[in-house]
Every structure is written in structure tokens, then in C-alpha cells.
């Protein structure tokens, strides 16, 4: 495992290969229920097989809760983020983390051949980097211990 890993390596190690999504006309209440039930923080919003938006916990808090709106009477299309930042499976993990930091986002839908194939979170990326750094430290410790004339 290397820090130079790609998004595809993260998707390959995720517990589920299923990609959850929603549509614009679904109520926020239903979308939040799905997110809660699947323990995820965002849902790509789909129309005709294409990602047209993303709805996140932050969208819910800022556009429903803090505005006193009803989640049962509000459609996802009314609160979703329309300008979706996406990546391909070959995107570098560190580059994705930098992009998320620069744009203050926590989820990246993964698109391959125009099709949604997954989503990675900032947590997925951080876990991968920490794991890669741990492996590198172990390798260096092994090298130092073998090279030491103790």
C-alpha cells in the first residue's frame, strides 16, 4: 500500500460495492433516512443515469434545519449542491485530499465512462494515507534494525 494509491484501490477495499443515490424529487426526509440507515454522509443526485447534484448532511443542516423548513415537505432538488466535483478511478489519493481541502468538500463521486461507480469520503482518503504511512514506517524500522550493528 502506497500513498500514491488511486481512488480505485479505495473503492476495491470498501465494505460495499453498492453505490447509493437519490433523485431530485425525493423528499429530504427520505434521503436523510437512507443516509442514516446506510451510515453515509452524502448521496449523489441522479437524472437519466447522470450525476446532476449531491446532497450532504451539510446541505440538510444549512438549508433545512437552520432555515426551519420541513424535511418532509422539501425535495432534494431544492437543497442539493448542483456544482458537483467528481473524480475518476485513476485519481491520486493525495490529489483528491488536496482538492477536497481546497474546495471545502467531504465527498467525491467517482465517474468512469460517464457512469457513477462509487463515492469516496474524506475519511476514506485519510484512512488510506494513515495506513500507507504506517506501512512505510514499519518498512523503515525493519531496514534500520537490520542495518544497526547492535
Q: Language-model segments: what does each one mean?
A:
Residues 1-150:
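Tandem CBS (Cystathionine beta-synthase) repeat/Bateman regulatory domains
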Amino acid at each position: 500500500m502506497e500513498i500514491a494509491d488511486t481512488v480505485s484501490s479505495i473503492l476495491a477495499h470498501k465494505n460495499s460495492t453498492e453505490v447509493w443515490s437519490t433523485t431530485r424529487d425525493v423528499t429530504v426526509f427520505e434521503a436523510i433516512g437512507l443516509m442514516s440507515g446506510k451510515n453515509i454522509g452524502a448521496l449523489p443526485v441522479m437524472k437519466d443515469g447522470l450525476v446532476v447534484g449531491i446532497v450532504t448532511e451539510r446541505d440538510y443542516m444549512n438549508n433545512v434545519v437552520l432555515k426551519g423548513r420541513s424535511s418532509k415537505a422539501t425535495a432534494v432538488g431544492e437543497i442539493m449542491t448542483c456544482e458537483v466535483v467528481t473524480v475518476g478511478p485513476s485519481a491520486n489519493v493525495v490529489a483528491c485530499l488536496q482538492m477536497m481541502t481546497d474546495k471545502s468538500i467531504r465527498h467525491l463521486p467517482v465517474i468512469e465512462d460517464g457512469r457513477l461507480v462509487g463515492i469516496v469520503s474524506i475519511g476514506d482518503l485519510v484512512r488510506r494515507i494513515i495506513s500507507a504511512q504506517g506501512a512505510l514506517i514499519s518498512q523503515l524500522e525493519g531496514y534500520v534494525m537490520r542495518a544497526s550493528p547492535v
